[in-house]
A protein has these predicted regions:
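N-terminal glycine-rich "phosphate-gripper" loop used for MgATP/nucleotide binding
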Residues: 50-54, 61-63
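Gly/Ser/Thr-rich active-site loops/lids in small-molecule metabolic enzymes
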Residues: 155-159, 163-199
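Short glycine-rich anion-binding loops that position phosphate/pyrophosphate groups of nucleotides
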Residues: 54-56, 79, 167-169
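Proline-centered loop/turn at the N-terminus of a beta-strand
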Residues: 16, 68-70
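A conserved acidic, glycine/proline-rich C-terminal tail/linker
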Residues: 211-236
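Conserved small/polar residues in nucleotide/adenosyl-binding loops
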Residues: 271-277
Length: 277
């Protein structure tokens, strides 16, 4: 199992290892006895290793939050933009990291505040990729009145609206026709989901802009999603989205940069297109 391989590699290199409590309880039969677990992190930790895909990194961020602990993503599935280290490259990657041969990519997050208190959102109100509002009912569109810094922009008549970070620009927003934004760019993108008016295009804005959304529609409620977490809000809510006060630090190895991953992704898409011609 690659987890036991990783633990063995780290122990040989005299690294102190702590596994997340829930994960540890599932794997402890496979692990050496002197492995510790954690439920919360503090600033005494040097690095968090996430094993899975980009979704696993989104969960890892909920542990790190504002602590500035660098995160490294090991990919056990398809090629990801965040979890970029392949399973068969674990040993090389660990040695590079221990030797300090890496750079830090700082990623902006966005957070949401609602005019009416919502317990689910107040516990964890930030997202790395995107915050999206969308219709709850599958048959009718919603109108999303959108303001930027309290100035009226537009009322989008659509299935929903995505507010994406540069990191999230390669995800849901991209599949709805949004642009790819370089991770270090200080921007956000507003992308309509299946707009009624085909002239409603994605809009790139400065990331210090405060975005205010008010939803109207036949239903009294709408859905709001923060990355993979989703909850229901009443139409009486005003949703305010802005940049979070903290950033996440992602470890990037020299041969695993954003441009290399982007090129590989684009090449894969092009190859699939050629194969179907």
């Amino acid at each position: 199992h690659y987890i036991t391989k990783l633990v063995s590699l780290l122990k040989k290199r005299k690294v102190s290892i702590f596994l997340e409590e829930e994960y540890y309880s599932q794997l402890k039969e496979l692990l050496p006895e002197n492995i510790n677990s954690f439920t919360k992190l503090d600033k005494s930790y040097d690095l968090l290793i996430s094993i899975g895909g980009d979704g696993t990194i989104l969960k890892a961020i909920t542990f790190v939050k504002h602590l500035s602990i660098p995160i490294v993503g090991i990919n056990s599935g398809r090629l990801g933009f965040l979890a970029k280290i392949k399973i068969d490259k674990i040993e090389e990657a660990i040695d590079e990291i221990i030797s300090g041969n890496y750079s830090i990519s700082e990623r902006s997050l966005i957070e949401v505040v609602t005019s009416e208190k919502n317990n689910e959102l107040s516990k964890l109100n930030f997202a790395l990729n995107e915050i999206a509002v969308s219709r709850k009912n599958t048959t009718s569109m919603i109108s999303i009145e959108t303001k930027l810094d309290d100035k009226y922009l537009n009322s989008y008549w659509a299935d929903g609206l995505i507010i994406a970070t540069p990191t999230g620009s390669t995800g849901y927003s991209l599949s709805c026709g949004g642009p790819i934004i370089m991770p270090e760019a200080e921007n956000l993108v507003i992308t309509p989901i299946a707009p009624h008016n085909l002239n409603a295009r994605p809009l790139i804005i400065a990331d210090n802009t405060e975005i205010s959304l008010k939803v109207n529609g036949r239903e009294n409620e709408f859905l709001i999603s923060l990355d993979s977490r989703i909850t229901t809000l009443s139409n009486t809510n005003v949703v305010v989205i802005k940049k979070s006060p903290f950033k996440i630090k992602m470890i990037e190895l020299e041969n695993e940069s954003f441009l290399i991953t982007l090129r590989e992704k684009l090449t894969v898409s092009y190859t699939h297109l050629r194969a179907h011609e």
